[in-house]
Amino acid sequence: MRKSQKYTREFADEVSAKMKAQLEKWKFEPTQIADIHSNLRRMTNQFDTPGPEMRKIHDFNVPDEDYPIPVRLYIPHNASEEPGPTFIYFHGGGFVTGSIESHDGITRRIASGTGYRVLSVEYRLAPQFAYPAGPEDCEAVLQWALEGYGQDEWGIDRHNVSIGGDSAGGNMAAYLAQKYREDVKAQILFYPLMQMVDFKPPKPGPQDWLQLGFMALKFIDEHYVNGSDPNETRLSPLFEDNLKNLPPAYVLTCGLDPLRDEGKLYADNLTSQGVPVEYWHEKRMPHGFLNFAKMFPKGRKIPLDAADFLRKHMEPQKG
């Protein structure tokens, strides 16, 4: 256990140092934007393990007035042939990076663990597209599913949809669960970014430079929030007062993560208003560890735990 903990800290320190150095250089020239995405994908390939094989995978676009939104539909071997439960996933990456590809392992594990269809969303990213482009894309895909447009061709049961995401994706999932509380069956929030007003935890420590640090959060404020009111609940779902009748929530936080306190606070707020919550805190894990399942075995286990949660709160498949 001691060796594993040391390895975790060394790895997080290394990632943080590289991130800090790179953030100081980025001015968002087109070539640098491409480098951001390629570097993340390279890290994921190096430190993640391939997810389970699927029966079918379909890449297509969800039509929208502003932007045809790329999505990937995972259909696991144990999925029903009939329209069935579907989990919509919004990837993390600080609103400026991340993709369907970078989170392929996570979504495959959830699909296999549930036996449900999983729809992963490639929403627009800052700085090319600052707020509210990303949330608008995620909402458009959710509306498309809830209105039944994915049922006949893709087997998405409009009456049985859940949503979730990690980090930035968790931020958008939390807001959409609030807005569509009567329609969404469950929500999965992996180390979510819940507010944009104060990026420092109440008791900051050296662990808060690990993987996701204050500089990276400041970077999000400058290039994603970009002058918008950070008190809006679409940016800061933590500030929503009315949480009654929200769908059941699975909330994960990490000890080596400056977002840990706001994630825990949101879980407590949900519980206080009668929302069923399953809360997990991984004390020795850094932000983003689900993308590094080769390094952290819990990166393989947590998506399966979340899959168990989804099965508890979504309708069983037919047949």
Where are these regions (language model features)?
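Catalytic active-site module of serine/aspartate enzymes centered on a nucleophile-bearing elbow/loop
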Residues: F296-G319
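A glycine/proline-hinged amphipathic helix-loop "lid/cap" segment
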Residues: M1-P76, E315-G319
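Short beta-strand/loop motif that positions the catalytic acidic residue
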Residues: V251-T253
